[in-house]
Amino acid sequence: MNIAQVAKQFGLTAATLRYYERVGLIPPVKRKDSGIRDYDEEDIKWIEFIKCMRNAGLSIEALIEYTTLFTEGDRTVEARKNILADERQRLIEKRKEIDETIKRLDTKIKDYDGKLRENEAKLKSRPKTESLHGSVEQRR
């Protein structure tokens, strides 16, 4: 696949794919004799992995380190596992923060629901002749 096809498949730009390769987020992509990148199935798997990890909030630095270690072979399995475990823990902590924020928002929304119900009850309890501008007699 060429860069335009891969970019379209993943909703990325060609510039982003070039950047991923340049900074080491993905291993170097093979090229045709003409110099055009020729993405194979392994490259596609790397892009899927990087996109998934970036969407989850992993830092570019952590992913570059992971990719670098991967290219060094099986002797780096433990280090790669540690990177992923550290990032997983960071995401768990982030999820806790998000859950707490959602709880606070839910509380505030309930508070506002209560205020809205109070205001509606006040409006319904007013005499029919009274409006926001006073009673009909007061306006004459």
From Swiss-Prot:
Inducing factors: By aldehyde stress, positively regulates its own expression.
Keywords tagged on the record: Activator, Coiled coil, DNA-binding, Stress response, Transcription, Transcription regulation
InterPro entries: DNA-bd_dom_put_sf (IPR009061), MerR-type_HTH_dom (IPR000551), MerR_fam (IPR047057)
Effect of deleting the gene: Loss of expression of the adhA-yraA operon in response to formaldehyde and methylgloxal.
Gene Ontology molecular functions: DNA binding; DNA-binding transcription factor activity
Coiled-coil annotated spans: 75-125
Region (Disordered): 120-140
PROSITE patterns: HTH_MERR_2 (PS50937)
Annotated region of DNA binding: 3-22
GO BP, one annotated term: regulation of DNA-templated transcription
A family per Pfam: MerR_1
Chain's role: Transcriptional regulator involved in the response to aldehyde stress. Binds to the promoter region of the adhA-yraA operon, the yraC and its own promoter region; binding is unchanged in the presence of aldehydes.
The protein's name in its UniProt record: HTH-type transcriptional regulator AdhR
